[in-house]
A protein has these predicted regions:
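Short N-terminal binding/cap micro-motifs at the start of the first secondary-structure element
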Residues: 12-17, 45
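Short amphipathic alpha-helical segment that frequently serves as the phosphate-/nucleotide-binding helix
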Residues: 17-22, 86
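Short gly/ser/thr-rich secondary-structure transition/capping motifs
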Residues: 47-55
Length: 187
């Protein structure tokens, strides 16, 4: 089974993975295992009040996982998230594996230099000027979700487009199946 790891922080946005996780668990793709990781094993509570206990700590993420998906959270990506997440995200990117970041997680990815050589999108590109680690304003595209190779970003209003682009990056299913899934939730 190919593992896709979702990183959750406190006050995570429960809707931002609500389309991708089931798509990977058989709605669109076969052969994927979805797992949730965080800095510790304590329960995380979503913006909507959903309580989830991570299955893994960041240090337990398997080296052979196929993708790392960073889910937005109300304020948590702005409150000094663990350095281990940046290490993992760069390692996944450097080894050609898929990295997805949505909403404030995409902003954070830009702040740690993860988006400096790829086209990407964000909630608000203007606030990126505050981050010396971000040097790719010209790579910003005003779109719901952007895929550049194995890096996928999305603004917080685009969980369906984000799911479709992560599925494409993983080559998890034929394009027709991915597009039909996305269309079902957007048309």
């Amino acid at each position: 089974m190919k593992q896709v790891i979702f990183v959750l922080l406190d006050r995570y946005a429960d809707w931002e993975f609500a389309y991708l996780a089931p798509a990977l668990r058989g709605e669109v793709a076969q052969g994927y295992q979805v797992r949730f990781a965080s800095s510790d094993m304590l329960a995380k509570i979503s913006i909507g009040g959903l309580t989830m206990r991570p299955q893994l700590t960041l240090d337990e993420i398997p080296e052979d996982a196929h993708a790392l998906v960073l889910i937005g959270a109300a304020g948590s990506w702005r409150e000094d998230p663990p350095e281990r997440i940046a290490q993992l995200a760069h390692a996944f990117k450097d080894s050609g594996r898929v990295v997805g970041a949505i909403c404030d997680a995409a902003r954070w990815a830009g702040s740690v230099g993860l988006l400096n050589d790829v086209r990407h999108t964000l909630n608000d590109p203007h606030e990126m000027a505050d981050f010396p680690g971000y040097t790719n304003a010209q790579g910003y595209l005003p779109e719901e979700s952007v895929r550049d190779g194995n890096i996928v970003t999305a603004n917080g209003n685009a969980p369906v487009a984000f799911a479709a682009n992560v599925l494409r990056a993983l080559e998890a299913a034929p394009e027709k199946a991915i597009q039909e899934y996305a269309d079902f939730y957007t048309i």
